[in-house]
UniProtKB/Swiss-Prot annotation:
Belongs to the ATPase B chain family. GO terms for molecular function: proton-transporting ATP synthase activity, rotational mechanism. F(1)F(0) ATP synthase produces ATP from ADP in the presence of a proton or sodium gradient. F-type ATPases consist of two structural domains, F(1) containing the extramembraneous catalytic core and F(0) containing the membrane proton channel, linked together by a central stalk and a peripheral stalk. During catalysis, ATP synthesis in the catalytic domain of F(1) is coupled via a rotary mechanism of the central stalk subunits to proton translocation. Component of the F(0) channel, it forms part of the peripheral stalk, linking F(1) to F(0). This is ATP synthase subunit b, chloroplastic. Its main location: plastid. It comes from the Eukaryota. HAMAP family: ATP_synth_b_bprime (MF_01398). It comes from Morus indica (Mulberry). The gene is atpF. F-type ATPases have 2 components, F(1) - the catalytic core - and F(0) - the membrane proton channel. F(1) has five subunits: alpha(3), beta(3), gamma(1), delta(1), epsilon(1). F(0) has four main subunits: a(1), b(1), b'(1) and c(10-14). The alpha and beta chains form an alternating ring which encloses part of the gamma chain. F(1) is attached to F(0) by a central stalk formed by the gamma and epsilon chains, while a peripheral stalk is formed by the delta, b and b' chains. One of its GO terms (cellular component) is proton-transporting ATP synthase complex. Pfam families: ATP-synt_B. The lineage of its organism: Eukaryota, Viridiplantae, Streptophyta, Embryophyta, Tracheophyta. In plastids the F-type ATPase is also known as CF(1)CF(0).
């Protein structure tokens, strides 16, 4: 335990924010700590993230398939509408003298309603895909953040005793205060 805590005892020997100095304590340098944390996150989070993304992909693909089926149904309805349109056009030729304007209005209404239905189905498909993508992204972000936080807290709690933990927190609070003053 002494070998693990020796580098943390040197925290009190850090140069102040206004002076220049080199920190030779390898465990207290930011790039190494960050690379260790990132390595742990990548190692433990890769499998979970891969599973989450695969599940999300399957859900999105299922939604796309459902939307495609709805689209095919709409295309079938459109084809039926076109065949009815052809039938109406034939009847229009026969009854042109008696009711040409009425048949023309019916034809336009039929085309408009079919186009609106197809457009609504396409919009529904696009909204569903967008919603599922956003939900998947948000879920992945939440889980990665939670795992990163748990991993970091677990690492810190396993390496620090109470006194060192309090000193580290005080030092970090001081550094954040200094950084905030600099940025303000």
């Amino acid at each position: 335990m002494k070998n693990v805590t020796d580098p943390f005892l040197s925290l009190s020997y850090w140069p102040s924010a206004g002076s220049f100095g080199f920190n030779t304590d390898i465990l207290a340098t930011n790039p190494i700590n960050l690379s260790v944390v990132l390595g742990v996150l990548i190692f433990f989070g890769k499998g979970v993230l891969s599973d989450l993304l695969d599940n999300r992909k399957q859900r999105i693909l299922k939604t796309i398939r459902n939307s495609e089926e709805l689209r095919e149904g709409a295309l079938e309805q459109l084809e039926k509408a076109r065949s009815r349109l052809r039938k109406v056009e034939k009847e229009a030729d026969q009854f042109r003298v008696n009711g040409y304007s009425e048949i023309e209005r019916e034809k336009l209404n039929l085309i408009n309603s079919t186009s609106k239905t197809l457009e609504q189905l396409e919009n529904y498909k696009n909204e569903t895909i967008h919603f599922e993508q956003q939900r998947a992204i948000n879920e992945v972000r939440q889980r990665v953040f939670q795992q990163a936080l748990e991993g970091a807290l677990g690492t810190l709690n396993s390496c620090l005793n109470n006194e060192l933990h309090l000193r580290t927190i005080s030092t970090n609070i001081g550094m954040f205060g200094t950084m905030k003053e600099i940025t303000d």
